[in-house]
Amino acid sequence: MAIKKTLKWGLIGLVVAGVAMLAVRSYNSLGGPVLQPWHTFVPVELRAQELDGADWARYMAQEEAIFKSVRAEVSQKLEPDARVPINRYFEASPVYPARFKQDWNRSYIMEPEGKPVGAVLLLHGLTDSPYSLRHIAKLYRERGFVVIGMRMPGHGTVPAGLTDVRWEDWMAATRLGVREARRRVPAPAPLHLVGFSNGGALAMKYSLDVIEDPLLPRADRLVLFTPMIGITRFARFAGLAGLPAVLPPFASAAWLSVTPEFNPFKYNSFPVNGARQSYRLTDALQGQIDRLARSSRLGTLPPVLTFQSVIDFTVSTPAILTALYQRLPDNGSEIVLFDVNRTVKFEPLLRPAAYVALDQLAPKTPQPYRFTSIVNASEDSHATLERSIAPGQLQAKDRALTLPYPPGIFSLSHLAIPIPMDDSLYGMQPDMKAPPEFGYHLGAMDARGERGALIVDQDFLTRLSSNPFFPYLLERVDEGIVRPSGPTGRNVTAVATPGIPVRLEAILSTFVPDDIRPFAGP
């Protein structure tokens, strides 16, 4: 009887808390920013079933129609107060994408000089566009690969595109991209998948799908940048936040953030459905990894090379190891982690966890993958080392790098990994003598002043958007193109390090005191 009474009151408490949360969410949405045409106009994308029956020409035709519809329904219908230079949808704006030599919001194909030696499919991240992997595309083209940079459904157009998309649409688009890659460069020429953030989850899931459906073309190598294997914060509950939006007065409740759109190749605003679909994708991915691991069917996975910051606000770094790498076979896989900058004297301001994150992630028992970290040579030196633990070993080997950790940068970020420091748009050190290639040097803005004066959160200016170690990253990706890695031959098997399962970790992380705001996008 006492147990029933406790359960009854517990259930009542949950219902009351849920109603209170929805009431607060509804009230806040009434006072939020007014939704603009780019928040309300939803372009017509091909859905999963249509994508599975389409070819590249069909996808390109639909993409062209989508961009024409955005111009007609958004850019050409702007109210006078939206016709400002900082609005990417204003045709006279310096950040209007269609005015550039190439609109990197669109899918593209790069052909190498001479006969192709392989093909690579590039999969960008959530709220992102094919722009983010264009420097990786250049490397692959120089190495003789046909490069397919694919725009995922709901991306590159208007943020409202993410209000109606499903993760199954992204997976179907990935399959379409692989089909086109193999049409242009048939097997046995190598096929690589490169994924950034949400694109990393898509690349990984595609490779798992191949195990269960041998008719799908197999990738020979995966390169992942900050892959979305597990999501931090409240993403798993994001759908609840959007419930008030079923009533028109609370339409803005369908959005986790509504921000001016000044970034030509990435959305600033983020709808609830974007977080919801990313969570559904990672949940399906983790479940599939668990299922295939239990049946010992992961042995045919291709080598996976991952680059990740130990500090990441968007994805769970521990989940990459516990949910993925500790399940991988001995196949030449490697993870590269970028440590915090220990010479920056921010210790009183940085969370204590930042200084111990790398030690907690390092293997405690021999593993079948290579564990590499980029660290300061010492705590008072900007010089850096590559510290690598080989598969089946625990002893690390150091290699000095010629890339110092820049003063003033205390860590890398989720966004920064695949972007060089001299990138014209996002780079911290672009060529300031040349006119901006894409309207502004967003990554080089170093603004200080009074709070409340800017139209955006200071995160937009202080969050690092380029990687000081990009030359190293490019070198390592190139190594895998020229000299592909493979098994050690030592029959190394994964040994799970002590810790809680990734799904339980995700649930518990929701109640951490500093975890007090919803997942607001990458």
Predicted regions mapped to residue ranges:
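N-terminal targeting or regulatory segments adjacent to alpha/beta-hydrolase or S9 domains
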Residues: A2-A92, T384-P522
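Serine-hydrolase catalytic core
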Residues: M21, I109-E113, K266-A453, N467-G489
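Short, surface-exposed "cap/lid" segments of acyl-processing enzymes
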Residues: A98-G156, G486
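Cap/lid segment of the alpha/beta-hydrolase catalytic domain
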Residues: L122, P153-E168, L240-P244
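Catalytic nucleophile-loop/oxyanion-hole region of alpha/beta-hydrolase
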Residues: V158-P190
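Short beta-strand immediately N-terminal to the catalytic nucleophile in serine-hydrolase-like folds
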Residues: L193-G195, F225, F307
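Gly/Ala-rich beta-loop-alpha elbow adjacent to hydrolase catalytic centers
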Residues: V194-G199, A203
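Active-site nucleophile loop of the alpha/beta-hydrolase fold
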Residues: L222-F234, V340
